[in-house]
Structure formats: C-alpha cells, structure tokens
Amino acid sequence: MLTTGVDIIEIPRIKQVLDRYGQRFLDRVFTPSEIDYCNGRPPNLAARFAVKEATMKALGTGVRGVSWKDIEVVRADSGAPSVELYGRAKKRAERLRVCEISVSISHSREYAVAFVVAQLTDQPELKA
C-alpha cells in the first residue's frame, strides 16, 4: 500500500519569513545540516519546507502531529533527496509500517513543490 503527500509553497513567502525572523525561523524548522546545506538560499529552504509538509501529509499527521525537525531532508549518495525521520515522525512511520519513503522536489523562480510517497509493508507489526 502507498500513502502520498504533496506540498507547494511560494518561495517569496519563505524569503519574507526568513527576513523577518532570521535564525529563529531556521532553528525552529530546520536541522543544522539543512541550514548549512541551504546556506540561506530561499529556494532551497522552501523546497525542504515543502518536503517536510508533504511528508507530514504522507504520514497522516498534519503539521501539528510532529516537530518540523523530526523530518530531515538529506541527500543520498546519488544526489537524490530523501528524508530521515526522528521522534514522533519516526514512531508514526513505524506504526504505519513504512518500509520506504521516496521524495521528489522541484522549484521555479516563484514556487517550490515536493511530492512524497511512503510505501507500507504488508507484514503485520511485531509485538515485543
């Protein structure tokens, strides 16, 4: 079974929030490695923000269900985007029996979009 999440965000909106709140915004939403990778570039920050929201949707939690930093956007060795889950996001994925998460990101001058597919295993959850 598959679950999906998609999100689109206006890059100027992220720039406005970054201009207004600066490091406070970055520290609330992004991990240190995401902050380093994006280096303050609004298109990159917007794309990662969209991935986080799309992942929350694929997990069925919404933005109130997990912390922003429970979802970290990383790069595979191939350069493809992926996510690492922590905290409540990881627990939710385990409950759903997520065995794989695929991520696609794109952005233009004005918008960033992310599409996330979570593949669920058909195996019953093991009880300890």
Q: What do the PLM-derived regions correspond to, one by one?
A:
Residues 1-128:
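Core catalytic alpha/beta fold that binds nucleotide/phospho-ligands
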